[in-house]
């Protein structure tokens, strides 16, 4: 966000488009990085969001893990109005903004929100958040200290719906591999499409886990490519301070 510090602060309701979809999002003094970057640069996370749009076109149940202010949840609900989205967000301020964004777009139905974090166990833990005047854009993470929060593994969530779990989006600032471990039964039973944030320190663990269930992996990060390309995570070089988005599926894609 530093590159936008000398530009006017954005406050209001802003239109956001992903392929065929257009919806509104709230921003107050640059507090949502996705809106700020999209406003000044356009096509924010185009590859990732477009891929999620394609995934969620099929009716089913979807998880948005680390849902922040609801961008992926909104896309999943608009992509197919019959979908059901389960959104997990540990920061109550972000969750409040997500609910406001859902209400703004008349999307309060077919969505369940959980205030907490996802991992490989269910219980309590601590969540460390970096606050400043753009706190909605800052990533927090499960830590040894911070705010006490509820933690849940996806396999422990009771879903009273017989429809297939078709997709999981995971953006948890380094907890991503543990989220996969906590969803192993779901992944084994349903083989959902997965979009996951990957770092150098967890790429091998994530690759080995996905390979065990015969997933193919594709790079969908606008930061490093303009197209969806197949990639073997064990060969992918990621800088220590960066992350990339990976699309994992058992299907062949064009």
Give the predicted meaning of each segment.
Residues 1-155, 158-162, ...:
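S-adenosyl-L-methionine
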Residues 13-14, 80-84, 157-254:
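Conserved acidic-Pro-Pro-aromatic motif
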Residues 24-28, 151-152, 227-233:
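Short amphipathic beta-strand/extended segments with alternating polar/hydrophobic composition
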Residues 28-30, 114-116, 151, 220-222:
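Conserved beta-strand termini and adjacent loop/short-helix elements that scaffold enzyme active sites
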Residues 40-63, 124-126, 138-190, 201-205:
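Short internal loop-to-helix segment that lines adenine-nucleotide cofactor pockets
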Residues 67-69, 92, 120, 172-174, ...:
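Short, glycine/acidic-enriched loop or turn micro-motifs at the edges of active sites
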Residues 71-74, 96, 123, 177-181:
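Short N-terminal helix/helix-N-cap motif within the alpha/beta-hydrolase-1
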């Amino acid at each position: 966000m530093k590159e936008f510090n000398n530009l006017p602060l954005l406050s209001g309701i802003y239109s956001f488009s992903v392929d065929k979809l257009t919806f509104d999002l709230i921003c107050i003094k640059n507090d949502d990085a996705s809106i700020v970057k999209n406003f000044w640069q356009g096509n924010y996370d185009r590859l990732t969001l477009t891929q999620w749009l394609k995934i969620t076109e099929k009716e089913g149940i979807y998880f948005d893990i680390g849902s922040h202010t609801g961008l992926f949840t909104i896309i999943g609900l608009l992509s197919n109005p019959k979908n059901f989205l389960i959104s997990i967000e540990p920061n109550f301020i972000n969750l409040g903004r997500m609910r406001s964004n859902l209400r703004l777009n008349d999307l309060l139905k077919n969505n369940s929100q959980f205030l907490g974090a996802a991992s490989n166990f269910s219980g309590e833990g601590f969540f460390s958040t970096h606050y400043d005047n753009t706190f909605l854009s800052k990533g927090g993470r499960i830590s040894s200290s911070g705010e006490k929060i509820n933690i849940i593994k996806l396999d422990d969530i009771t879903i009273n719906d017989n429809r297939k779990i078709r997709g999981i989006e995971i953006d948890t600032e380094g907890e991503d591999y543990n989220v996969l471990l906590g969803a192993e039964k779901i992944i084994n039973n349903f083989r959902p499409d997965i979009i996951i944030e990957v770092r150098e320190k967890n790429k091998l663990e994530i690759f080995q886990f996905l390979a065990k269930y015969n997933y193919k992996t594709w790079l969908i990060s606008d930061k490093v490519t303009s197209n969806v390309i197949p990639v073997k995570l064990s060969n992918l070089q990621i800088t220590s301070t960066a992350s990339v988005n990976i699309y994992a599926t058992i299907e062949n894609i064009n």
